[in-house]
């Protein structure tokens, strides 16, 4: 298995496509090897879950507000009916400083809609230093394809 030894093929395809869909074995291990190989090649890596991502561009690059989950009937006296808004720093704020390329690895990518996945591809096109890897589910062996190719099927 030369891929697990070097990761060059994956890195080459990631650099050319910008946005990759990965199907990894459910036992785990393959994705962490690839992340380690990418870090060794000079990439900054950020691992995150795709659940609750919202608007990808705002969540990744801009300061944005979040609200607590709705917990049923509550008194309106403590705040607005929608709850208190808290400001959160962007996920990739610190990672995008400098000149190093950044890989965002999203777990549980199968919960994202087609429009959210295409928005991630557009982000990679607009910001050439950003590369996105989305885990789209499990497979018997590690395989990947460009996310645009997956969306066109």
Swiss-Prot record:
Keywords: Membrane, NAD, NADP, Plastoquinone, Quinone, Thylakoid, Translocase, Transport
Membrane topology, from the record: Peripheral membrane protein
Major localization class: membrane
Pfam family of the protein (one): NdhN
Compartments (UniProt record): Cellular thylakoid membrane
Catalytic activity: a plastoquinone + NADH + (n+1) H(+)(in) = a plastoquinol + NAD(+) + n H(+)(out); a plastoquinone + NADPH + (n+1) H(+)(in) = a plastoquinol + NADP(+) + n H(+)(out)
Quaternary assembly: NDH-1 can be composed of about 15 different subunits; different subcomplexes with different compositions have been identified which probably have different functions.
Free-text function comment from the UniProt entry: NDH-1 shuttles electrons from an unknown electron donor, via FMN and iron-sulfur (Fe-S) centers, to quinones in the respiratory and/or the photosynthetic chain. The immediate electron acceptor for the enzyme in this species is believed to be plastoquinone. Couples the redox reaction to proton translocation, and thus conserves the redox energy in a proton gradient. Cyanobacterial NDH-1 also plays a role in inorganic carbon-concentration.
Assigned protein family: Belongs to the complex I NdhN subunit family.
Designated name of the protein: NAD(P)H-quinone oxidoreductase subunit N
Protein's organism: Synechococcus sp. (strain CC9311)
């Amino acid at each position: 298995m030369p891929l697990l030894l070097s990761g060059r093929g994956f890195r080459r395809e990631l650099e050319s496509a910008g946005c990759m869909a990965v199907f990894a074995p459910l036992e785990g291990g393959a994705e962490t090897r690839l992340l380690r190989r990418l870090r060794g090649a000079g990439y900054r890596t950020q691992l995150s879950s795709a659940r609750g991502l919202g608007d990808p561009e705002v969540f990744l690059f801009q300061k944005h507000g979040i609200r607590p989950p709705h917990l049923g009937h509550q008194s309106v006296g403590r705040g607005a009916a929608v709850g208190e808004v808290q400001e959160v720093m962007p996920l990739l704020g610190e990672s995008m400083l400098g000149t190093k390329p950044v890989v965002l690895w999203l777990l549980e990518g199968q919960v994202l809609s087609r429009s959210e996945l295409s928005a991630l591809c557009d982000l990679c096109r607009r910001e050439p230093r950003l590369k996105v890897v989305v885990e789209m589910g499990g497979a018997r062996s590690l395989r990947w394809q460009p996310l645009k190719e997956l969306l066109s099927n």
